[in-house]
A protein has these predicted regions:
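Low-complexity, glycine/proline-biased repetitive segments and flexible coils/loops
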Residues: 2-30, 39-251
């Protein structure tokens, strides 16, 4: 099971003494802006993919779209008091034993100023030495075949992207991709690290890929990426990604 995504973003308000309000949204719904709000900076994080079983690949992190700290996409102009629809889906399920592939994570969608921004769920990890990782916001790690592609569908910086990176393909049981780096960057089965941001003094680390699994008899675990990626296990079922970070599940 992978960690689901969410929305984090400072809301810029207009008043005699301009203030900035940060709102974190972890569930779907229609959220009403304050009447003084004129623009919104956002970070949208999709749900991570599930890890594969039987030395399966790690799940890819959920895609990340953001206007915050993005020179190519300014804060989105909005009308004060407007409703903002948000959809946040669940993380992908881990693969059934023996040898099942992980499921892709769900998308996160936010509608601001008439524009819909959709971050793609992470790709599921490949299964039991026989399948590649799934494509998604960040790609799932391979078990057989090839690693999943990240930033799928492609989102340029002007639309808040890129969403993420590819899964790892160095070995069977490769780590899932994270927002900050591809899977297997920090080791053969390690999940890719996510992205670290500080918003109004509060640090967030998001969208790490899940660690990959290994053949029966290999000891220990393979680490998930920073940002909620679940650890892969070389002897048992991998761990889930951390809730509300978009982290991928371990293989």
């Amino acid at each position: 099971m992978a960690g689901n995504g969410g929305i984090i973003g400072p809301v810029n308000t207009v008043s005699a003494a301009p203030a900035v309000k940060t709102t974190k949204i972890d569930s779907s719904g229609c959220h009403t802006l304050e009447t003084t709000t004129s623009s919104v900076d956002f970070i949208a994080v999709a749900a991570g993919g599930g890890g594969g079983s039987n030395y399966g690949g790690g799940g890819g992190a959920g895609g990340v779209l953001k206007s915050f700290c993005n020179s190519c996409l300014a804060a989105v102009p909005v009308t004060g008091g407007a409703n903002v629809p948000v959809t946040i889906a669940a993380g992908g399920a881990g693969g059934n034993h023996p040898g099942g592939a992980g499921s892709s994570g769900g998308d996160t969608t936010i509608v601001l100023g008439g524009t819909t921004f959709t971050a793609g769920g992470g790709g599921g990890g490949g299964q039991g030495g026989s399948s590649g990782g799934g494509n998604g916001g960040s790609g799932g790690g391979k078990s057989g075949g090839s690693a999943g592609s990240g930033n799928t569908p492609a989102k340029p910086a002007a639309q808040g992207g890129p969403q993420g990176n590819a899964g790892g393909g160095a070995v069977q049981g490769g780590g899932g991709g994270g927002r900050g780096e591809a899977g297997c960057t920090d080791g053969d089965r390690a999940g890719g690290d996510g992205i670290a941001l500080t918003i109004n003094g509060t640090p967030y680390t998001l969208a790490g890929g899940g660690g990959g699994g290994g053949p029966t008899g290999d000891p220990g675990t393979s680490p998930g990426g920073d940002g909620g990626g679940g650890n892969g296990s070389l002897t048992a079922e991998g761990s889930a990604g951390t809730a509300n970070t978009g982290g991928g599940g371990g293989g």
